[in-house]
Amino acid sequence: MELALSLGDNTKKQFSFMEKNSKINNPSVSSTSTSEKDLGFCMALDVAFGGHRSLSSSSSPSVEDEKKKPAPRAKKSDEFRVSSSVDPPLQLQLHFPNWLPENSKGRQGGRMPLGAATVVEEEEEEEEAVPSMSVSPPDSVTSSFQLDFGIKSYGYERRSNKRDIDDEVERSASRASNEDNDDENGSTRKKLRLSKDQSAFLEDSFKEHSTLNPKQKIALAKQLNLRPRQVEVWFQNRRARTKLKQTEVDCEYLKRCCESLTEENRRLQKEVKELRTLKTSTPFYMQLPATTLTMCPSCERVATSAAQPSTSAAHNLCLSTSSLIPVKPRPAKQVS
């Protein structure tokens, strides 16, 4: 990135961020040079990548000298670098106002020229004009501030391609080793093929005893023309199948028990709900008061049992047959 600054003249001088110390040590030279120039102000900003530009304090040569110089040939090392942008650099032009005194406008007919545009040329031409501030020699293409994206990206691609190739080789080797292992296992571990007679004899032996001692195993292997290891493996598999079947039967039994318990629980919950409903609802029958005297409406008089036995009998019959209505008790009449 460069920052070019000019004051009103047509010279294409650029001022970068890293100025020489000579300009700072000799302020008189800079003051005299600026006094002879117009008060125009121009600032240019240039950004370049790859091997085209680098940060260095340099003053560009004149346009005529640059046109006379032959174009430098691109080096082989620059083939992978990103080409720099063709767009012109950004420029900022500032003019002084008209209220300044006329003697400060310069010596060019009282007119202040516009800011001179800085032209960015090739790096080799710039470095030949003014030496760079970097550690590398002036005519070198690269510097410490150069951003070389092309070579970095190319190197990254090469490393990634190499890594992919190595991974592919490892995967192919692992597949080959797995296939070899499978072939070896297949040759050594073949499935045992038994005839019907051998299977029936082994089944009968398993019903008698599910486990075999070494002597029984050897005798059974000789009788069936098999190896002792094959007989042992058959018994192990038969015990595993028996255990699996028993486990399946137990699971089915537990499943049925769980279903029956679920149905019973649902029925009990339904009964509890019905009982709670009956408890909270009103009763269907009417309760009679405890301390009331009931009397038949046809019997208005109460007589003693000795005086009128027939009347009391009729009264009792009436109480048993007629409807009962609660009435208030009356005092008994005295018979004179």
Curated annotation (Swiss-Prot):
This is Homeobox-leucine zipper protein HAT14. It is found in: Nucleus. Signal peptide: none annotated. Residues 254-275 are annotated as: Leucine-zipper. InterPro entries: HD, HD-ZIP_Homeobox_LZ_Class_II, Homeobox_CS, Homeodomain-like_sf, Leu_zip_homeo. Residues 130-141 have a biased composition (Low complexity). Residues 120-129 have a biased composition (Acidic residues). Keywords: DNA-binding, Homeobox, Nucleus, Transcription, Transcription regulation.
